[in-house]
Curated annotation (Swiss-Prot):
The gene is frr. Its main location: cytoplasm. Responsible for the release of ribosomes from messenger RNA at the termination of protein biosynthesis. May increase the efficiency of translation by recycling ribosomes from one round of translation to another. Gene3D superfamilies: 3.30.1360.40, Ribosome-recycling factor. It comes from Paenarthrobacter aurescens (strain TC1). Residues 142-161 are annotated as: Disordered. It is found in: Cytoplasm. This is Ribosome-recycling factor. GO terms for cellular component: cytoplasm.
Length: 185
């Protein structure tokens, strides 16, 4: 039972790190990155559809993203969705593909994004600590109910602490990398 609790906590912590990684990827750095458009929804034949299901992405240079729709009739809808998105880029449509030029970030905007990234990183750490707290409560209950010995409970708690530290450290590493990427001119 202890092993299942630790395994479940580890899986949930892995998921929290993945969510943080996705959140960080969706924050613009001034460099072309197709992940910026993961959350763009296109109104396609009346149905809200994620952009990555309608087009392929290419990055010909550091400031340009090339979006090639699988269905050319979706060009206008994709262009409208890109214009309306919060990414802050101006798409240009040449009839076959959409080119999105990523504007240079100002110093103030970079600092603003760093604050956002730190907030998302802190949210991820809080989530990991919450998972740890719930797992610890489960472990304590197992020991209290006599399903596990106190020594086993103490060993499992040490494992849980190591697991928590490992995941918090990986969030810190992701945070440090994203911050460096944002502040790089």
């Amino acid at each position: 039972m202890i092993e299942e609790t630790l395994l479940e906590a580890g899986e949930k912590m892995d998921k929290a790190v993945e969510v943080a990684k996705d959140d960080f990827a969706s924050i613009r750095t001034g460099r072309a990155n197709p992940a910026l458009y993961n959350k763009v929804i296109v109104e396609y034949y009346g149905t809200p559809t994620p952009l990555q299901q309608l087009a392929s992405f290419g990055v010909p240079d550091a400031r340009t993203i090339l979006i090639t729709p699988y269905d050319k009739t979706a060009l206008r809808d994709i262009e409208k969705a890109l214009s309306d998105s919060e990414v802050g880029a101006n798409p240009s449509n040449d009839g076959n593909v959409i080119r999105v030029t990523i504007p240079e970030l100002t110093k103030e905007r970079r600092k603003e994004y760093v604050k956002i990234v730190k907030g998302k990183g802190e949210d991820a750490k809080v989530s990991i600590r919450s998972i740890r707290r719930k797992a610890k409560d489960s472990l304590d209950k197992l020991v209290k109910d006599g399903e596990a010995g106190e020594d086993e409970g103490a060993r499992a708690e040490k494992e849980l602490d190591a697991l928590t530290k490992q995941h918090v450290d990986s969030i810190d590493e992701l945070l440090k990398r994203k911050e460096a990427e944002l502040l790089e001119v």
